[in-house]
């Protein structure tokens, strides 16, 4: 292929070829099935998305024409001219930005507008500067569980709180890695993990950890009744932004956590 054929069109075609491999990497990090219901849109960027926050009434209603601002995040990677014909290398290079993007998504879903602290050191760009508009599962900065408080007791209390707020499940829990390790540790000489007594009350595979959760913190939430979802105008994909000497690509996605019923969330305490 002649050198002058390496243009933006070539870059876009290469991006389309390596995109499916990136989705595999993202799905490994996101974990399947996702805890938060996904609402996929039409693979185009949107300036605003529908706001489905419910006024419980009675009768229940949604404010007409309410809108939310999504966030568009990206992670850049570059191919030198000598690497233009090596599709395998390009796909491998894209794996690191894909991992960073998946972690950034996790941090934003948990912390919303406060996620910037957790994105430091990562090659992540808030393309439209809308991080400040985002809401997270942690309504405020979470405080660590007391040292003498068990994760099981904390989850039970969270379940009771949600049920008093007329939330009927299915229930899910996201905790910090250290709380997760403690929860799956057997009691004494038993082989039964500490978390076992409350697992029947949670959705199947509904107890998970996030590296973006600070030590000894967690959140419990109900996903029934459309209480929350993740609206995705355009899911993770690869774009070629320019070919000028080297070729610049980005891993990019646009999404919005919609908390349709704030009563469906409770920070573990």
Put a short name on every predicted segment.
Residues 2-73:
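Assembly/oligomerization interface modules of large self-assembling protein complexes
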Residues 2-20, 240-269:
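Protruding loop/beta-arch "assembly-hinge" segments enriched in small, turn-prone residues
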Residues 72-157:
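Alpha-helical scaffold segments that mediate packing/assembly in large oligomeric complexes
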Residues 74-80, 174-179, 222, 261:
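Helix N-cap / beta->alpha transition motif
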Residues 106, 182-184, 259-260:
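Short helix/loop capping segments that flank catalytic or ligand/cofactor-binding pockets
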Residues 114-119, 178-182, 256, 265-266:
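Short, catalytically relevant binding-site loops at active-site mouths
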Residues 144-229:
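Extended oligomerization regions of viral-like shell subunits
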Residues 216-256:
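Terminal interaction module
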């Amino acid at each position: 292929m002649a050198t002058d054929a390496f243009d933006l069109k070539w870059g876009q075609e290469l991006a389309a070829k390596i995109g499916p491999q990136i989705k595999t990497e993202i799905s490994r990090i996101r974990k399947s099935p996702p805890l938060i219901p996904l609402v996929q849109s039409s693979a185009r960027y949107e300036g605003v998305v529908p706001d489905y926050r419910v006024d419980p009434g009675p009768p229940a209603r949604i404010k007409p024409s309410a809108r939310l601002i999504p966030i568009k995040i990206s992670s850049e990677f570059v191919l030198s001219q000598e690497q233009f014909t090596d599709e395998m290398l390009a796909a491998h290079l894209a794996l690191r930005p894909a991992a960073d993007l998946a972690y950034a998504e996790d941090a934003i879903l948990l912390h919303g507008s406060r996620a910037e602290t957790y994105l430091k050191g990562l090659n992540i760009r808030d393309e439209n500067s809308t991080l400040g508009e985002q809401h997270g599962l942690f309504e405020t900065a979470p405080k660590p569980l007391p040292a003498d408080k068990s994760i099981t007791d904390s989850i039970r209390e969270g379940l009771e709180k949600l049920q008093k707020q007329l939330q009927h499940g299915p229930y899910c829990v996201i905790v910090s890695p250290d709380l997760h390790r403690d929860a799956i540790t057997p009691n004494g000489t038993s082989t039964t993990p500490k978390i076992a007594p409350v697992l029947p009350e949670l959705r199947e595979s509904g107890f998970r950890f996030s590296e973006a959760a600070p030590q000894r913190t967690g959140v419990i939430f109900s996903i029934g009744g459309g209480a929350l979802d993740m609206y995705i105008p355009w899911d993770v994909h690869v774009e070629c932004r320019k070919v000028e000497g080297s070729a610049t690509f980005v891993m990019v996605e646009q999404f919005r956590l919609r908390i349709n019923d704030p009563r469906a969330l409770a920070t573990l305490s």
